[in-house]
Amino acid sequence: MPVHWVDKLVAELEAKLQNRGKDEYIFNGGLSVSGLQHIGRLRGEVLLGEAVRRELEKRGFRVKQLLTLYTVDPWKGKDEQRREFPDPKAAERYVGWPLDRVPDPKGCHASWVDHFWSDFGPYIGVFTDGKIEVVTTRELYKGRLKEFITTMVLPRRDEIRRVINKYRGRKPYQEGWIPLEPRCARCGRIDSTEALEILGGERVRYRCSYCGYQGESSIEDSKLNWRIEWAGVWWSLGVDFEPYGKDHATPGGSRDSAAELARLLGFEPPEGVWYEWVSLRAGGREADMSSSGFTGITPREWLDIAHPQILRFIYFLHPPTRRVVVDLSEIPSYYSQYYRAERIYFGIEEASTVEETRYLARTYELSHPSNPPAKPPSQIPYSHAAIVAQVVGPERLWTDGLERLKRAGLLGHDEYSIRWAKELLEKAYKWARRYAPKHLKFEIPDSPPEDALRRIEKPDLLEKLAEVLESVEEWSEERIKQALVEFGEGMSSSERRRFYRDFYLAIVGRPEGPRAAPLLSLMDRGFVVDRLRKAANLSRELKGR
């Protein structure tokens, strides 16, 4: 693998920023809070800029990172959006309203924006170093964007119209066009009004094509044409670097049009890099994560089941122009990849090439919102944590759960490892309940269910297994695995399948479950032996009735 893409991007950007000659550089990202604020939005609009910022800060640059929420965009009222309301039909009245004026469909926040931002905004500091400031276009329209409109856009609106018409193709704007969309005082829409006249430089007269109303509005209660608005945000904030999604990256597309408008108005557009979407795979199907389409999971939901370092690792492992597919059933695999990079970082393991070793070590370093641990921490396989969590139950994760991990030799005594283990047990338990494959999702009933006992074919084998396990010299995964292999010697493949079917019926009450050796090693030996004997005896009794 070559030099890490983050370092390559930093090297390219460093010279370009120096040419701008500023004391402080502004990095920005942009989000429209049109619905579900999913983890895909962290990739390009938050984490990419954060990684570059932090590296430039190490080189002596002063950088301020912003995240702009486009809260004045019109609410489109897609089916998925309307279904968030108790009465989707009644919600049609909000179509065209500014996003921050649409009510919260669940009634727990002040607005649509506040509701859906609540699962994203408060968690930015968990996924990053926290040095990111959030601004909204609503705030900007009351200040710098208003100034941008009155001093730069309106005096040159005919030149702006000609630039935009180059990119529009169909339905070019006619002479006299005013690039403002006032909010209608009667119906509340901002997507159906036509600005007719500027009054005294501060107000605008308009007509609404939806309800027919004519009236006046302040400029700050209006919205710019979106291409001009993008350039206006750059100017208002003084943006020097801003990543953008692939939908804006087409040659001659929206990014190019905003950049041309910026140069027309006398300032340079920010440096940028485009990024690919993040997709979600579930049930064998893949779909791009979508805010207004309500596809994906939020940062809050991710933190329920995995550490922020894991998502950062996934994102920084791949260049931003590479598509990333997240599958929540694969969380254990993501942890395994992260742990391998951790071993490589600490020199415990090497990859197949020097280049790959360096790349993975660097990716691991970037995966930490702060600094990596000072020494190699314990590495608890995620699937093991899921097994332990289900064995002990949610109330005993930090007591019995930690103790079982220690007995299994999976947990050290350093503060970092213990904190990680506590968090991991909680996350793995929730993952097992929500996303785990069927064979990893189980409960240990107090007593084997009667229907399971009736299905046990050879209770004598379970009793013999109990004797073998009782005499295992060391209750560890490796020794248990060895004992199980030896116990199954001489069985045909079909006999071995039936034996394990009986085993799982006795232990978890189902004909399948997690791999036997890890499962047993994380349970008490005495419980396992007693359980197998009890299941064998009860099974024989039921069959003898």
From Swiss-Prot:
**Gene Ontology CC annotation, any one:** cytoplasm
- Name any Gene Ontology BP term: lysyl-tRNA aminoacylation
| Main localization, broad class | cytoplasm
Q: According to the UniProt entry, what is the EC number of this protein?
A: 6.1.1.6
Entry annotated with the keyword Cytoplasm = yes
Q: What Gene3D superfamilies does the record tag this protein with?
A: 1.10.10.350, 1.10.10.770, HUPs
Short motif ('KMSKS' region): ranges: 288-292
Catalyses which reaction(s): tRNA(Lys) + L-lysine + ATP = L-lysyl-tRNA(Lys) + AMP + diphosphate
Q: Which GO terms describe its molecular function?
A: ATP binding; lysine-tRNA ligase activity; tRNA binding
Alphabetized UniProt keyword annotations: Aminoacyl-tRNA synthetase, ATP-binding, Cytoplasm, Ligase, Nucleotide-binding, Protein biosynthesis
- State the span of motif ('HIGH' region): 33-41
Instruction: Specify the enzyme's EC class, one word.
Output: ligase
Q: Where in the cell is it found?
A: Cytoplasm
Pfam families registered for this protein in UniProt: Anticodon_2 (PF19269), tRNA-synt_1f (PF01921)
Q: What family classification does the UniProt entry report for this protein?
A: Belongs to the class-I aminoacyl-tRNA synthetase family.
Report what the protein is called: Lysine--tRNA ligase
Species name: Aeropyrum pernix (strain ATCC 700893 / DSM 11879 / JCM 9820 / NBRC 100138 / K1)
The gene from which this protein is expressed is lysS
